[in-house]
Amino acid sequence: MKKLWKILLLAAVCASLLTGCFVEDVEMSAERVEAASGEESYADWAVYWYNCGSDLESKWGCASGDIKEMLSVDLSDKVQVVVQTGGAKKWHNTQMDADKLQRYVYNSDGFYLVDEQPRGNMGSPETLADFLKFCKSHYPAAHTAVVFWNHGGGSVDGAAFDENYDYDSLKLNEFYQAFQSAFDLSTDNPPIDVVGFDTCLMATVDTAYTFCDIARYLVASEETEPGCGWYYTGWLEALSENPGMDGAELGKVICDAFEKGCQDEEVADEITLSVTDLSRIGNLMEAYESLGQEALLNAVDNPGFFPAMGRMASRAENYGGNTEDEGYTNMVDLGDLAYHCAELLPESANAVREALADCVTYKVNGPYRAKATGLSCYYSYNSDKKDYSGFADIAACDAFTYLYGYEIDGSLDDRGMAYLNGIGFEREELAEVPTLEDVSTEQDYPVYIDDEGNAVMDIGPDIANMLKGVYFRLVYVDEEQDIAILLGRDNNIYMDWENGVFQDNFQGTWGAIDGYLAYMELIYESNDYNTYMVPILLNGEKYNLRVVYDYNDGQYYILGARKGLDANGMADKNLVQLQPGDEITTLHYVASMSGDDSFALYEMDTFKVTESTSFGEVDMGDGEFAMMFELVDAHNNTTWSEMAVFTVEDGVIRTEAAE
């Protein structure tokens, strides 16, 4: 059994290595004309569309698809759209040239190419600034909207990842630099009516603060967007029919059109899109800073606060994937985080939710993003120093910057200590932040079998208070066939956090696609539903199937397939829906019992998708299964329990502790 324990431990480590739209080439043409002068082109509304095609265009033609949606609208003479295209190695239409930055105008007269520049980096603030100046000079309007189209990476990584320049992106401070060079900025009279992000993950409190003297309204998504993105036909038609609408009305129209478009494509389960009134952001920033201050003072008074907050953050709705498998965006819904931290932070949590409700004037969200309040914030789920450093460069809140700095480094610099002193902290030194490494030994936490045959881990309240989560890993074992198969990670265990006692809930069942056992990894847990990542090959390409378990009806639902974050922090915008005839191959980590303990990723079962393809639990039948509890602290350090072994024979489960 000692050999089996090593296999299970290696499986848990190896598991961390796992990691729609498609448009045919579009017929499109634009007459080449000179750019208009400002006076002759003045309109009620001008939309400045910064279209960084990236691999969304070169692989799938998503940008061409949205431009085609625009061209299907008969615009009135009150509305015009100025589009800059770039950032893609290839365009799926007959007009755009990937070797140039091109500027087009679409209005009541037609579609025109009005300017060309040599290829430039769409992830550069200078490129954006030049486009904004061009639009301001040649195509002014009474009301303006600036729309960014591409990938998004949240507060730290920004948006507009140019695949021609190593996926360089515009960070929030670079967005600000570009607008500042093109416009006179003012919180009382911002130059832009609406700034919109048709990207993933950019409805953040840091984004809102960045644009508060640039625009009146922010329209963006907290979650990753489906590949279909915004429905340009819908909202541009509405704007053309009613050019007298203001920014708030336009934001609502964009949200409603987006929701309808996603529903039509059957990808609306996890959507989010919100409209934020940036003139009201000041009250939210004050409340957000107060929340951070209360958290920081709690943490320096008792560093055990960090795992307690970590448990609340893991329950709060978070976006883009925050696991080793999917990558970390470190973005969590601000309102839901405040809700879960209400007992930890009673003086400030409710004020945050009230301020959010005041400044988020409209939002849409799918049934499995029901807790979205409109803006997300940064939370360091992975305690990564490099990612935290990126956050510190753009953070809209000093208190949370110092809070995460203390959690990750265990100390604060002189500025951090001065900030602490300014909010009432009087000691000269900070206590060390406790981690599992401080109490770890060569022995794993013991497991015993109680009188009812349950595997129990009793770590006591002191160790439990260091943890932000407890999970389990399950492996199928066949000693006769000399094989061990990792089944996955879940939280379906009984938890007594107050006393530090955790107990298995093994029932001999596991998740499967059409009856074929699947590796499944918990990536989000809440009282209403859990979300799982299931690695597969889909028509020969590796994807993560997204599956939810809905506690309301006790059913699993397949939402679609998506790839995780890439090395640049870029979220995959293309949620692929399974289609009848698609080929799925399940992926598992497999090791021999007698070999060198190394796990390898194997293709297991291959089958075709049908109209009735579904995910559900199946009885695994007779066999031997091994489980370990997984303990995770506030720093994302992980340690393990000893192993429990379940032997199932004729439907009867016998449990024993491994020797």
What are these regions (language model features)?
Residues 22-140:
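N-terminal extension/subdomain marker
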Residues 1-8:
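Bacterial N-terminal signal peptides that target proteins for export
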Residues 11-15:
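Alpha-helical transmembrane segments
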Residues 26-40, 137, 159-197, 202-659:
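Terminal, contiguous helix-loop blocks that mediate binding/assembly
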Residues 17-20:
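C-terminal motif of bacterial Sec signal peptides marking the signal peptidase cleavage site
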Residues 85-187, 199-200, 205, 222-223:
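Catalytic-core segments of thiol-dependent peptidases
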Residues 46-51, 80-85, 144-148, 193-197, ...:
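Structural recognition of the beta-strand scaffold that forms the well-ordered cores
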